[in-house]
């Protein structure tokens, strides 16, 4: 199972990504969670302490590693476009509650779409992750898909956009769907988070095609408490976990 979970900051995509990761890990699956968000907080959501998170150096910031694998240095402007990265998930991931966390970091490719060694490195790692045959791979990503090439995107089992019940959030889904289509992805799914009432749910169901909507997660103060304390939502909110478990059941049926 290969999942890319995206959405604007604050909508709850990391709550979904971390909870799915822990649900799969509890089943005994091998789970690798990749944090590809500039505001990296997947580690906290999985159960790491703030001190442990602060000690992690993102792959994109490991200059020596990037130079070693790509051949790029200050004196050498030429570098490999397909560096060897197959060993990186095992070497540089951190185990937490049965999940291997790989903090990727991000690279600002700029408006011109320029490519640097760090960007090539991240794209190569993401591509390699999609070929881990029997593993569950969950990518927690920002709303842009800059680090996904056509081959990587087409290997994903599910693209999931987390939204809130609002017009701007729905527009994010539409933007991601357009970008994903350009990469050869046939379907983009949606999870609506922070749904407070029937009116919110009706808005979501009116804005999102039924075949794209995986489900809703209702607004839950327990999730807010977990975030304030820097704890994993998995350990705080049985209601939210049950709702995400129902979403997982749909994903499992489609995997099989």
Describe the residue ranges of each PLM region.
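Conserved catalytic network of the ASCE P-loop NTPase/AAA+ motor domain
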Residues: 24, 93-94, 128-132, 153-154, ...
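Conserved nucleotide-binding/hydrolysis micro-motifs of P-loop NTPases
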Residues: 38-39, 107-109, 143-144, 166-168, ...
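Switch II (G3) loop of P-loop NTPases
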Residues: 104-110, 114-115, 126-148
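Walker A/P-loop phosphate-binding motif and the immediately C-terminal alpha-helix
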Residues: 2-38
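Inter-motif core of Ras-like GTPase G domains
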Residues: 124-133, 148-167
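N-terminal phosphate/diphosphate-binding loop that engages ATP/GTP or pyrophosphate donors
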Residues: 23-97
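Conserved beta-strand segments of the P-loop GTPase G domain that flank and frequently precede/overlap
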Residues: 103, 161-164, 190-193
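C-terminal lobe/tail of nucleotide-utilizing enzymes
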Residues: 179-256
């Amino acid at each position: 199972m290969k999942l890319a979970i995206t959405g604007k900051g604050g909508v709850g995509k990391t709550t979904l990504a971390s909870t799915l990761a822990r649900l799969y890990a509890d089943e005994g699956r091998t789970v690798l969670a990749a944090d590809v968000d500039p505001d990296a907080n997947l580690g906290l959501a999985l159960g790491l302490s703030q001190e442990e998170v602060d000690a992690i150096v993102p792959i994109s910031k490991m200059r020596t590693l990037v130079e070693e694998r790509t051949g790029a240095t200050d004196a050498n402007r030429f570098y490999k476009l397909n560096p060897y990265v197959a060993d990186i998930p095992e070497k540089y991931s951190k185990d937490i509650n049965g999940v291997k966390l790989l903090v990727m970091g991000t690279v600002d490719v700029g408006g011109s779409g320029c490519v640097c060694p760090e960007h090539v490195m991240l794209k190569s790692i993401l591509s390699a992750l999609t070929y881990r045959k029997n593993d569950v791979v969950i990518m927690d990503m920002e709303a842009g898909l800059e680090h996904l090439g056509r081959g990587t995107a087409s290997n994903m089992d599910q693209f999931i956009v987390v939204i809130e019940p609002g017009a701007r959030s729905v527009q994010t889904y539409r933007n991601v769907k357009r970008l994903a289509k350009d990469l050869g992805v046939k379907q983009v799914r949606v999870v609506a988070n922070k749904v407070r009432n029937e009116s919110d749910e009706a808005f979501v169901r009116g804005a999102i095609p039924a075949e794209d909507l995986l489900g809703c997660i209702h607004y839950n103060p327990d999730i807010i408490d977990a975030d304030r304390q820097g704890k994993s939502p998995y350990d705080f909110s049985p209601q939210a976990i049950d709702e995400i478990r129902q979403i997982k059941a749909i994903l499992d049926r489609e995997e099989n």
